Amino acid sequence: MTVNLTELDAHEQPSDQMRAIWKSYSRADKEELLLNGAIDDLEKPEKAAEFVVAGTVPAATLTKGFAFLGSGFDAAASDAPIYYHPLLPGLLIFPSIVPLEVQKTLLSKLIHRDLSVPAHQTNMHLHYELPYVERKPTDGEGEPEDCRQSFFSHSPDSPVRFQPKDPDVHKPLSMKQVMDRRLHWVTLGGQYDWTNRVYPEEEPPKFPPDVAGFLETVFPDTIAQAAIVNFYTPGDTMMMHRDVSEETDKGLVSLSLGCDGLFMIAPSDIGKMSEEERPEDVKKQYLLLRLRSGDAIYMIKESRYAWHGVPKVLKGTCPEALEDWPAEDGRFEEWRGWMKNKRINLNVRQMRE
């Protein structure tokens, strides 16, 4: 697929048809969805038969990538399979590529550490002053470095508040209100301008090198320059959109942690494609993938500019081993169970060549 990047409009909307389909899934009952056969689930044999094996990620590559995040992880036991669907051969799917212990480490780095960096903008920054935790170098002795400035250092009923920039418009928010429902995203590296849909020209904050090392080992064709970490609670959604603000067509990486999410994706030209123009083995107009904790997708080729969104997060699907996070090793006990009701999605891209 050849794409003229200058012709892509970040403000363009999906077709009315795609929006209507997305909306129907967002409103559908979870149990009904799980039974009606609409979901493309690689763990269901009848659905898995529609997918094609694209290759594997060698176990040695995975082990090398995990080592960037810390020591002590078990070596990857086997190569990780990669799949695609004929509708979108450039949408590469990596089921269960991130083991649970590595998932926990990623959560700690992204939420304890990176969320606590003032240069990393969040959806809260527009209207609120964030109560960052300031600690002296001697504080937190014996505590992991990634945890020392975590917002979870405040208890859920802490008197600390997110103070509004304009008290006439917004009310102060408690730590529990923000961490449970009001925090929706944080950006790493390049800080995207959501109003103008562009990346600023000034030098961005440094992308976390350990996370970058992991990603670039497993997905070597994409340099990790910018990311958005999405915080979903069941009931939250992401509208259909295309990622077209980058000045390169390098692939997008997406990692899922926590509750399962339904990921809807459709070719960018699907509304213009007649049935005769579609590949003979493709009857679908879109995919509705069930992405589980530890799954990754890599959007390249024609899928790089495909319409995609998240119509539903499936309540009650967080792996049991993650449910209690961030409570572990005697820390953050008052927040035990926070992750049980969350889906964290790390979306990574290269801004420029």
UniProtKB/Swiss-Prot annotation:
Enzyme's top EC category: oxidoreductase
A GO term from the CC aspect: nucleus
Pfam families: 2OG-FeII_Oxy_2
Annotated keywords: Cytoplasm, Dioxygenase, DNA damage, DNA repair, Iron, Metal-binding, Oxidoreductase, Virulence
Cofactor (UniProt): Fe(2+)
InterPro entries: Alkb, AlkB-like, AlkB-like_sf, Oxoglu/Fe-dep_dioxygenase_dom
Entry's Gene Ontology BP terms: DNA repair
Phenotype of null mutants: Does not seem to affect growth nor conidiation. Displays milder disease lesions on rice leaves.
Residues that, per the record, bind Fe cation: H241, D243, H308
Catalytic activity: an N(6)-methyladenosine in mRNA + 2-oxoglutarate + O2 = an adenosine in mRNA + formaldehyde + succinate + CO2
Record-annotated Fe2OG dioxygenase domain positions: 223-352
Residues involved in 2-oxoglutarate binding: R343
Superkingdom of source: Eukaryota
Localisation per UniProt entry: Cytoplasm, P-body
EC number, UniProt record: 1.14.11.53
Gene Ontology terms for molecular function: dioxygenase activity; metal ion binding
Keyword NAD carried by entry: no
Cofactor binding, note field: Binds 1 Fe(2+) ion per subunit.
Family to which the UniProt record says this protein belongs: Belongs to the alkB family.
Function according to Swiss-Prot or TrEMBL: RNA demethylase that regulates the stability of mRNAs through an m(6)A-dependent manner. M6A is a modification present at internal sites of mRNAs and some non-coding RNAs and plays a role in mRNA stability and processing. Plays a role in pathogenicity towards plant host.
Protein name: N6-methyladenosine RNA demethylase ALKB1
